């Protein structure tokens, strides 16, 4: 009897510790009375609805303020979101006991993270940084030199992290350390792949960032509302609370919203003008034919039922319909993927930083899928395939030194002079 008591005694605290760590376990809905119930049957749904609505209100308000401040502030917001996402994902597979035996090992994860950040943003923003500092000769020389050796600098930082990792390998900890190494690199791919497209969209014109992001928010809100009030038919086993009613209702609302929002956003130069540098001043530009109104006569069978015979729309609204269809039909699969991932690790949410929503990563699953599509769609079907003077100048400023640019100018002048004389 004493042996049994002595043998069982240590198991009590272990059970309590595991319970605290897994208090959000949703593997099969155990411990959660509404784990696999539809929202329409959830007795606590109104409390959950109010908490979620309150958080959504503040997030939309803060987002609107940052959009008003401009491209650079939106990029800073994306960076902050990346850091929080990486933190949540790093913590997912960490084990406190192992980390205590590996002092400084967590710091290595962040070393790789900020090295990847330097590489990605250096590639995306290099030309705009050059455009910003061009008037200052000293800064211009410094920046162009850094850009020239940017890849070598990033590679050196990565190799230093790689050597650091090898030197920290510890007996009986190899498996944990290599799993963390692989997990870190997977996080970097997930986080920085989508963010690079997101930032590229921002500087192509806030419109191409704001509209796709807004459509995901609208789709998420109306999927929740339609499922909340009308949901009866489960949609997918990975997300038991998702319903066909919510999915269809959100899809219709998202497509309609895409068409209408494109018309509203397309009227503001602040949203449609691309930003060629890293300044924060007001923008004035010719937004191009996509954002100029066109008048279309309505077919007779439609105009008979309406008080007007023609409508004025922006050509970009047709592109917005494609974005709306993707946001409502394909992008939600990013959320389903995240749901399956969380079930694999037996967690409810990636974090708890947003009341009623979970963590930052829980809000970004569909946004990541949408940002990549928006960029690819914009480059493939919206941007004209022409070699413009601006693009040539960008390549000259970035790739050539000041002396080479002067030599090019002299050579170009001679060629033009010969053409004029020859004609």
From Swiss-Prot:
One of its GO terms (molecular function) is phosphatidate cytidylyltransferase activity. The keyword Lipid metabolism applies. The chain crosses the membrane at residues 60-80, 102-122, 149-169, 183-203, 205-225, 246-266, 321-341, 369-389. The modification N-acetylmethionine is found at residue 1. Its main location: membrane. It is found in: Membrane. It catalyses: a 1,2-diacyl-sn-glycero-3-phosphate + CTP + H(+) = a CDP-1,2-diacyl-sn-glycerol + diphosphate. Signal peptide: none annotated. Residues 1-32 are annotated as: Disordered. It is a multi-pass membrane protein. Its EC number is 2.7.7.41. Keywords: Acetylation, Lipid biosynthesis, Lipid metabolism, Magnesium, Membrane, Nucleotidyltransferase, Phospholipid biosynthesis, Phospholipid metabolism, Transferase, Transmembrane, Transmembrane helix. Pathway: Phospholipid metabolism; CDP-diacylglycerol biosynthesis; CDP-diacylglycerol from sn-glycerol 3-phosphate: step 3/3. Requires a divalent cation for activity. Its cofactor is Mg(2+). Pfam families: CTP_transf_1. May be involved in the synthesis of minor phospholipids and in modulation of IP3-mediated signal transduction. This is Phosphatidate cytidylyltransferase 2. The lineage of its organism: Eukaryota, Viridiplantae, Streptophyta, Embryophyta, Tracheophyta.
């Amino acid at each position: 009897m004493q042996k049994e008591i002595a043998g069982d005694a240590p198991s009590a605290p272990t059970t309590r510790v595991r319970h605290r760590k897994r208090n959000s376990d949703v593997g099969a809905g155990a411990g959660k009375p509404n784990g696999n119930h539809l929202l329409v049957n959830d007795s606590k749904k109104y409390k959950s609805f109010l908490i979620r609505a309150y958080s959504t209100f503040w997030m939309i308000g803060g987002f609107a303020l940052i959009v008003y401040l401009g491209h650079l502030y939106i990029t800073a917001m994306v960076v902050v979101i990346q850091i929080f996402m990486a933190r949540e994902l790093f913590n997912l597979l960490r084990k406190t006991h192992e980390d205590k035996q590996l002092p400084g090992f967590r710091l290595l994860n962040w070393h790789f993270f900020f090295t990847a950040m330097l590489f990605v943003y250096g590639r995306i923003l290099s030309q705009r940084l050059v455009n910003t500092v061009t008037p200052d000769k000293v800064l211009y020389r410094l920046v162009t030199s850094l850009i020239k050796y940017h890849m070598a600098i990033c590679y050196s930082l990565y190799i230093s992290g790689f050597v650091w990792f090898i030197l920290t390998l510890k007996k009986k900890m190899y498996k944990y350390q290599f799993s963390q190494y692989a997990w870190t690199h997977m996080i970097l791919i997930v986080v920085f792949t989508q963010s690079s497209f997101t930032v590229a969209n921002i500087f192509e014109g806030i419109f191409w960032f704001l509209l796709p992001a807004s459509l995901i928010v609208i789709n998420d809100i109306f999927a929740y509302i339609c499922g909340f009030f009308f949901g009866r038919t489960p949609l997918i086993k990975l997300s038991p609370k998702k319903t066909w009613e919510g999915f269809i209702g959100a899809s219709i609302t998202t497509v309609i919203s895409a068409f209408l929002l494109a018309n509203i956003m397309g009227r503001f130069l602040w949203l449609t003008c691309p930003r060629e540098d890293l300044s924060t001043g007001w923008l004035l530009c010719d937004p191009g034919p996509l954002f100029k109104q066109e008048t279309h006569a309505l077919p007779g069978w439609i105009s008979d039922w309406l008080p007007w015979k023609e409508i004025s729309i922006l050509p970009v609204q047709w592109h917005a319909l494609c974005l709306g269809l993707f946001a409502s039909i394909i992008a939600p699969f990013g959320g389903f993927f995240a749901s399956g991932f969380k079930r694999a690790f037996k967690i409810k949410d990636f974090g708890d930083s947003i009341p009623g929503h979970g963590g930052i990563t829980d809000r970004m699953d569909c946004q990541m899928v949408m940002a990549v599509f928006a960029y690819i769609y914009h480059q493939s079907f919206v941007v004209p395939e022409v070699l413009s003077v601006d693009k040539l100048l960008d390549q000259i400023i970035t790739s050539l030194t000041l002396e080479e640019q002067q030599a090019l100018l002299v050579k170009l002048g001679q060629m033009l002079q010969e053409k004029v004389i020859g004609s």
